[in-house]
Amino acid sequence: EMLRSLVGSEMCIRDRHLTSRQSVEIPFIKLDDVENVKAALAEGDVEPGVCGPRVRTITACQGQAICPSGCIDTYSLAKELDDRYFAKELPHKFKFGITGCQNNCLKSEENDLGIKGGIKVDWRESDCIGCGVCVKACRQGAITLEDGKISVDKSKCNFCGRCYKACPTDAWDTVHGYIVSFGGLFGNSINKGETIIPFVEDKEKLLKICDAAVNFFEENAKPSERFKFTIDRVGREKFEEKILEAYNG
């Protein structure tokens, strides 16, 4: 029904565009037809998106439901965040982006708040056969095999989970979680979002962090000021304090 509504034959809508943020755009609608088009779309349960100073459409890659590299269920998380924040009024636009793994197909660090799936691993010696497949799978050079024992340099590990996925004997204990970045921009100004907590291990903590970030922006931003510039102006130390408080609370 949603697809039929988007075809828009009754209103003679011939132009449709899939936007970079995974929405459907219908250009060239005459002003007098706008309400009729909205009503026709509503019959198929298609709701208008948003623009302006508010939380925008939350975007996500396909995640572990489709992609073998995926570390998290991106779709259900995007739906939950959408239900929680979509169209929330703020001093300026605020974008969420969710990507399932370190391949970063959705480029999470370009968003005001980016979420990247990750897997924290711990070697389980009892099930290891010393084949060295995990060493070859690790692109960060974080894993070494010496005298039949695996060592992991935690400072190099980026939580990609390749070692765990490649292991033929499942010799790894794993925790699926999230790498969260803040303050990304990719437009007139470009900035790579930065992490504060290396790895967030459960969704409840993730949601608390998201709430803290959105609330910080709502309470401190000036009109038409993007999140990155609010953090810079108010002070990164104060922002980090709020995020750590939410994480530890």
Where are these regions (language model features)?
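A gly/ser-rich beta-alpha-beta helix-loop segment of oxidoreductase catalytic cores
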Residues: H92-K120, R236-L244
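Single conserved hydrophobic/aromatic residue that forms the stacking wall/gate
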Residues: E1-G8, I13
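A common structural junction motif
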Residues: E10-D15, L41-G49, W172, F217
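Flexible, glycine/charged-enriched surface loops at secondary-structure junctions
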Residues: R14-S20, C51-G52, P91-F94, L145-E146, ...
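Helix N-cap motif at beta-to-alpha junctions
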Residues: I29-V34
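Iron-sulfur cluster-binding cysteine motifs and their immediate structural context
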Residues: V133-V152, R162-Y178
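Immediate flanking context of iron-sulfur cluster ligation sites
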Residues: D45-I58, R84-T99, S155
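A hydrophobic, small-residue-rich beta->alpha segment in the mid-to-C-terminal subdomain
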Residues: G177-I179, G184-A221
